[in-house]
Amino acid sequence: MVDANTSLQELFDIVVKTLDDVNAGEVFIVKELFRGFEWNRIGKSNRTKLGSMVFAYANGDEGSAVLEPLDKTPQNQQKYKKL
């Protein structure tokens, strides 16, 4: 269960695990990998840091085989495509 005390590493692990449920070719933002009320429980600074972690993962050796960073939304949220 996600709450204000959930560590960044735990949040990142949730993202990586949830990617299994995303179909290849689907475009998404990190926020969509969490239920609405869970995302709202994560502090703004941790949401920003989590976004940076996912972006680094997508550009790294392991993540680049799974995710492709795309452009950003008008709200400046990074979009990704599942490979």
Model-identified regions with their sequence ranges:
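Phospho-regulated, low-complexity intrinsically disordered regions of nuclear gene-regulatory
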Residues: 1-9, 18, 72-83
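Short acidic, hydrophobic short linear motifs in intrinsically disordered regions
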Residues: 26-36
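Charged, low-complexity surface segments at secondary-structure and domain boundaries
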Residues: 1-3, 36-40
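Charged low-complexity interaction tracts in eukaryotic proteins
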Residues: 32, 56-83
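Short, positively charged loop/turn segments that connect secondary-structure elements
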Residues: 8, 38-53, 66
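Positively charged, polyanion-binding regions of nucleic-acid-associated proteins
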Residues: 6-27, 40, 56-59
